[in-house]
Structure formats: C-alpha cells, structure tokens
C-alpha cells in the first residue's frame, strides 16, 4: 500500500520503521530541518530516509499549492503523520482514499495540542499513553483507531517517559498498521466534552515560582529535565538551572524562595520545601546541590527569585495610540489593575479615560497621530509594547469617506509599524474580522480561510483591504526583519463606551449603539436589508482578557501569531440583536423616561450606507489559536452584554425632563 509520511523525532523514526516492517511502500517522507537552538537527542528522520533510499523533503510550508500538487502526483492510498510539527491542510488529507492517520503522545481526547509529554508531567499526571487517530481538519480531533496506556512512575522524568512512550508506540503500530492495511479497523469518536488542549512550551515557560507548592515545582523540574532546557530560577541576576529535585516534608515558616539550608540545598515553597539535588549555575557544569549553593554564594536565609532582580523592578511600558477609544480605555483599565505596567497613551479626546488621568502609572497626551509624529517615534523607542489602535472602524464611513479611511487606517499605521521595525519593538496590531470579507467558510480560520472582498467600485471594502495589507506588511517584516508581532482580530466586541450616542446620531457608530439611540429617541429601529446578517458578538471583558494575555505573552507563544478573538456561541442576526435589546429596554428601571417603541423598519443598504456598500451574511470565528496561545475561552453570555451596554448608555442620557 502506497503511503506518504510526515515525520520527525524518535517517534518519526520508529513510525517509518514500523511501516516498512508492515509492508507499506513509502513514496516520500516530509520532515523538518533541525533547529540549531534545540538539543538534538533524538533520531534523524532525514538520515533514516536517506539510508533507506526514500525521497525526503523539508519544505517551510508543506501546505503550499505546489507541494499539494506534488503530493497528489504521488497518489498515496494512505497518509501517516508521526510527530510532524505543522498542521497538515485538508487538501492534503483528502488526497488519500484510505484516509490519514496521526500518532499522538497522549490518551486523546486529553492533552490535545503541543508537548503532551511535558504537560502531563507538569500537571502531575500518573498515566498517559499514545493514540493513533484519523486526521481531520481540526488538530488531534479525529476518531481514535488505537490507544495504549502508559503508567507514569513518581521518579519518571521527561526522557524516561519519552522512552516509555516510544516503546508503547512501537507496540501499538505493530498491532494496528496491518489492520489499517487490510481495512479492518474500528474507530471510536472522541468525546468532545472530555477534551483538553495545551499549547507550545518554550524554555522561558519553565521558571520556578516559589510561591507554588514543592510538589508542583518538582513536577516542573521532572517535565523539563535534561535533555530539555531545564527549570530555572535566579539569585539576584544570576540564573541557575535545576536538573533534579526532591519534595522535602519540611515544615517552615520561611518566605517562599528562602534558603532553609545549603547541605542539603532546601528551598522554602508555598507549601513544603524543594530539595535541589543537582543543578547548574549559568552555562557552567552540573553539580550536586550543596556545591551549587557554594557556587551561587547562598547561605541560610538567602532569597531566590523567578526572574532577574533588575527585571523585577522595571514595569513593562505599553504605548496605546487611540487610548480613549473603546478597546484602548478598557485595556488601560485592565493593565492598571496589575502592578507591573506603565501605560503611555495618545488620543484626540479624553472623556473615556478621565478616570485614569491621575493614576501614577498612566501618562496621557492629547493629540492627533498625524501631527504628533515626533512624540510617537520617541515613545515607540521608549516603550516595550506598541498597540496602534487608531482607526476609522464604522461602516458608514467606508463609503462616506473612503480616502480618509485609507489615510488614517493604512498610511498613518504603516508609519508606526516602521518605527517598531526601526527600534525593534514588539507590536500588537488590531487587524479585523472584516479582512475575511465574503469568505464562505463555516468558521473563519486565521491560517487557512481565504480573504475575499468585492469589486473596486464598492468602497466599503477599503477598510478591510487596508487592514489586510497592513497584516501582510507586518507578517513580511516579521519574516524578513525579525519584527516581534501579534495580529489580533476582534469579532464584534460590545460593551459600555462603545462609541457614543452623539456619534450614532450622524450614523457613525456600531450596530448596538445605533439601535440604543433609536430606542432612546423613539425612532424606528432600521434593519438594513432585513437585518438577517449574522454576527458573533463578544463581550468587551472577554475580548480585553484575551488581549491582556497577548500582552503578557507567556512563553512567547503569541509571537508571529494571528489570533481571532470572538465568541462563536454568541451568534445572532442584527434583527435578533434588536429584539433582545428591545426586551431588555422594556424591563429597564429607566424605561418610563423614554418614548414608546416605534417599531422595526426594513431599509435597503444603499439608502443607508450609500451605493458603494456590500454586506456579509455571516462572520463566525475559529478560536483554536486563542485556545492554543492564550488558554482563553469567552465566558460571557450575549444577553448579559446587551443588558450592561444598554444600562450604561441609558444612564448617560439627560433625564431632567419628567417621565413620559
């Protein structure tokens, strides 16, 4: 049976050997070039392929149409993936009539995603395993073909568990590959309600937080012990690595991170104490704990910290351009709730941020980004993270003032992007769900969905195209110049301070603000083209929490990523939004101050937005990247968001007149 294989690491090598032993004909193998920054303790798939006389390739993007066509020419009957690190597109999966199968290092549906070997140890699991499953478009979500359980012993570390999993995988493949070859397999659908998903781990994720329990820290040490990069901590600014440890039943009132003794080297934790059995100072040699204490100059009562002492003292400086806007003011509030951010902001007004103006860690200048270019360049250079949130983002303006939209949304933001490249600053750029345009996918996916817009004579697309081109420019700067970036795409965020009722009076606002104005003034709610267009509405608190996690960037997991931020469960048509808003309005304690409801009125989009408008029937996000990179899920129901947004705006209305 002809097969094409995607493979890497030891699992890739043993998978290839198992296929050959089972009589499969391997037409080609796709693998990765080794990362020079990664310790290569594992077997080489490329070398094995060469020794076996099998063509081997390591493309940067195997999902490129040229590679899809080459794989199609190989006519594989079945496809296998063994620890290949990139998601394989659906077009490739569909090339094999007998299907595609992936070997995953956990007991699916638990521990989908990256680095399951390390995550099970971090989380103190006592059992894991290997799973062979059918590949579908969603990562690690296909039906299970075979599983083998592996016990995790208390003394297992990453490398010993790795060897156990390799042994189990070899057994599983020996038993299962002949059955796949003869079409004699039983598939069991995964239970989605039991699924868990974990993201990529980097060396920076493995710092020891001494306020946690000794058992939790010991599990971290086990999870990343040699040949992985190791768990680490600091003495002042001196970094050291812990290679092995023991949980010590020592009851101490010492502060977490304090040295209890140096022989053995015992460190107080949030609960219990951790004995450092072996470790390494800086780039030195491995030594036993008491010698490490001597090398680091530790004595009883010394304090360890999770980050360098100098880093712990300096706040992260965040520059927010458009700080008075809907996202900017809510994000400022979230950042200032923490004690490690300094926020610098620029905007043409300050009404939404007036509550922060006296905050010691908030610095505001009133001004226009098209005028204050020197101030902006200076602060890009000064700050650590830049969020250029200035944009015209109201649909009526796309047809009313398309050139102004282009000048502000594209030209001014391009200048800021180039400052970030020049001074090597991290940029978190607000893309938009509008870039997907008229995409027909059920879920809009950051990495695979096509971005489809209308003809040139429909100026409503100038916003979408301006944002899309900036996305592509930022991506290219990341690839070619090393720009550190994250693109985030908000899907219909709603909440207090979304536009204002005065903006709604001239039509320059988002949907819910316009609908609230209609209720306040007693004018008919206008349903553009019947209001059947569906959107997924997201509470501003959910959106800001995701954006905050992008800024935090744990383990640099957000670098180079595009992340949809939306709530696919909160899908509703504009008509349904209007009905929900009306029901909330009728129950509101201030209802009697406002005129009677004037009804719904259907209007054509051309009469409301102008002749250059086109609408989109649906816009539902895939949030797999948000789950993977941010460990984030939206939580707030749409009705709660509507109630709070309505309440906020009703309480801004002058109610000096008598009730109606």
Swiss-Prot record:
Name of the protein: Bifunctional polymyxin resistance protein ArnA
Keyword Transferase assigned: yes
Role this protein plays: Bifunctional enzyme that catalyzes the oxidative decarboxylation of UDP-glucuronic acid (UDP-GlcUA) to UDP-4-keto-arabinose (UDP-Ara4O) and the addition of a formyl group to UDP-4-amino-4-deoxy-L-arabinose (UDP-L-Ara4N) to form UDP-L-4-formamido-arabinose (UDP-L-Ara4FN). The modified arabinose is attached to lipid A and is required for resistance to polymyxin and cationic antimicrobial peptides.
Sites annotated Raises pKa of active site His: 140
Region (Formyltransferase ArnAFT): 1-304
Any one GO CC term of the record: membrane
Enzyme Commission no: 2.1.2.13, 1.1.1.305
Keyword NAD: yes
The protein's assembly and partners: Homohexamer, formed by a dimer of trimers.
Entry binding sites for UDP-alpha-D-glucuronate: 393, 398, 432-433, 460, 492, 526-535, 613
Catalytic activity: UDP-alpha-D-glucuronate + NAD(+) = UDP-beta-L-threo-pentopyranos-4-ulose + CO2 + NADH; UDP-4-amino-4-deoxy-beta-L-arabinose + (6R)-10-formyltetrahydrofolate = UDP-4-deoxy-4-formamido-beta-L-arabinose + (6S)-5,6,7,8-tetrahydrofolate + H(+)
Organism: Escherichia coli O6:K15:H31 (strain 536 / UPEC)
Pathway linked to the protein: Nucleotide-sugar biosynthesis; UDP-4-deoxy-4-formamido-beta-L-arabinose biosynthesis; UDP-4-deoxy-4-formamido-beta-L-arabinose from UDP-alpha-D-glucuronate: step 1/3; Nucleotide-sugar biosynthesis; UDP-4-deoxy-4-formamido-beta-L-arabinose biosynthesis; UDP-4-deoxy-4-formamido-beta-L-arabinose from UDP-alpha-D-glucuronate: step 3/3; Bacterial outer membrane biogenesis; lipopolysaccharide biosynthesis
Sites marked Transition state stabilizer: 102
HAMAP family in the record: ArnA
Active site, per annotation: 104 (proton donor), 434 (proton acceptor), 619 (proton donor)
Alphabetized PANTHER family for the sequence: BIFUNCTIONAL POLYMYXIN RESISTANCE PROTEIN ARNA, UDP-D-APIOSE_UDP-D-XYLOSE SYNTHASE 2
Pfam families documented for this protein: Epimerase, Formyl_trans_C, Formyl_trans_N
């Amino acid at each position: 049976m002809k097969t094409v294989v995607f493979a890497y690491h030891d699992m890739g090598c043993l998978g290839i050997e198992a296929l050959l032993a089972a009589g499969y004909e391997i037409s080609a193998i796709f693998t990765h070039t080794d990362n020079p920054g990664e310790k290569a303790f594992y077997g080489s798939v490329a070398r094995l392929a060469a020794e076996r006389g099998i063509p081997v390739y390591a493309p940067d993007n195997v999902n490129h149409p040229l590679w899809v066509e080459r794989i199609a020419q190989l006519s594989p009957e079945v496809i296998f993936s063994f620890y290949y690190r990139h998601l394989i597109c659906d077009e490739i999966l569909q090339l094999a009539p007998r299907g595609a199968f992936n070997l995953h290092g956990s007991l699916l549906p638990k521990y989908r995603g990256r680095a399951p070997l390390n995550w099970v140890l971090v989380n103190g699991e006592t059992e894991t395993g290997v799973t062979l499953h059918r590949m579908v478009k969603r990562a690690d979500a296909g039906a299970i073909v075979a599983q083998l359980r592996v016990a995790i012993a208390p003394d297992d570390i990453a490398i010993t568990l790795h060897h156990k999993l390799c042994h189990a995988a070899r057994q599983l493949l020996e038993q299962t590959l002949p059955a796949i070859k003869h079409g004699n397999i039983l598939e069991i659908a995964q239970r989605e309600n039991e699924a868990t998903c974990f993201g990529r781990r980097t060396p920076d994720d493995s710092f020891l937080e001494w306020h946690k329990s000794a058992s939790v820290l010991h599990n971290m040490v086990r999870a990343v012990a040699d040949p992985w990069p190791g768990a680490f901590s600091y003495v002042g600014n001196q970094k050291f690595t812990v290679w092995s440890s023991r949980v010590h039943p020592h009851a101490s009132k010492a502060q977490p991170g304090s040295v209890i003794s140096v022989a053995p080297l015992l460190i107080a934790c949030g609960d219990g104490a951790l004995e450092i059995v072996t470790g390494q100072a800086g780039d030195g040699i491995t030594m036993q704990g008491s010698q490490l204490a001597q090398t680091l100059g530790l004595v009883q009562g010394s304090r360890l910290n999770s980050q360098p002492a100098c880093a712990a003292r300096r706040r992260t400086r965040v520059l927010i351009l458009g700080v008075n806007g809907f996202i900017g003011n809510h994000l400022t509030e979230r950042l200032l709730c923490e004690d490690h951010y300094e926020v610098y902001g620029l905007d043409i007004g300050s009404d939404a941020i007036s509550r922060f103006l006296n905050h010691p860690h908030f610095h505001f200048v009133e001004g226009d980004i098209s005028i204050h270019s020197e101030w902006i360049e200076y602060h890009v250079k000064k700050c650590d993270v830049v969020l250029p949130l200035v944009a015209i983002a109201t649909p009526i303006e796309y047809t009313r003032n398309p050139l102004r939209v282009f000048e502000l949304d594209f030209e001014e933001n391009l200048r800021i992007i180039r400052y970030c490249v020049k001074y090597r600053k991290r940029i978190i750029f607000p893309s938009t769900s509008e870039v997907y345009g008229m995409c027909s996918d059920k879920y809009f996916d950051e990495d695979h969905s096509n971005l489809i817009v209308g003809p040139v004579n429909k100026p409503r697309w100038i916003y979408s195209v301006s944002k899309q081109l900036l996305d592509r420019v930022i991506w290219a700067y990341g690839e070619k110049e090393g720009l550190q970036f994250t693109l985030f795409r908000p899907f219909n965020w709603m909440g207090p301070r979304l536009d204002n009722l005065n903006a709604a009076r001239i039509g320059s606002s988002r949907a819910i603000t316009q609908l609230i104005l209609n209720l306040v003034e007693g004018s008919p709610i206008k349903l553009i083209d019947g209001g059947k267009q569906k959107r997924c509405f997201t509470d501003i608190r959910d959106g800001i929490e995701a954006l905050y996690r992008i800024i935090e960037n744990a383990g640099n997991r957000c670098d180079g990523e595009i992340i949809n931020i939306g709530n696919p469960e909160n899908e509703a048509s504009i008509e349904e939004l209007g009905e929900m808003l009306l029901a909330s309005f009728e129950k509101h304690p201030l209802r009697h101050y406002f005129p009677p409801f004037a009804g719904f009125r259907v209007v054509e989009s051309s009469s409301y937005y102008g002749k250059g408008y086109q609408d989109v029937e649906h816009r539902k996000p895939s949030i797999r990247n948000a789950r993977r990179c941010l460990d984030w899920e939206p939580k707030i129901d749409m009705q709660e968001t509507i109630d709070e947004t309505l309440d906020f705006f009703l309480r801004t209305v002058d109610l000096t007149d008598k009730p109606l």
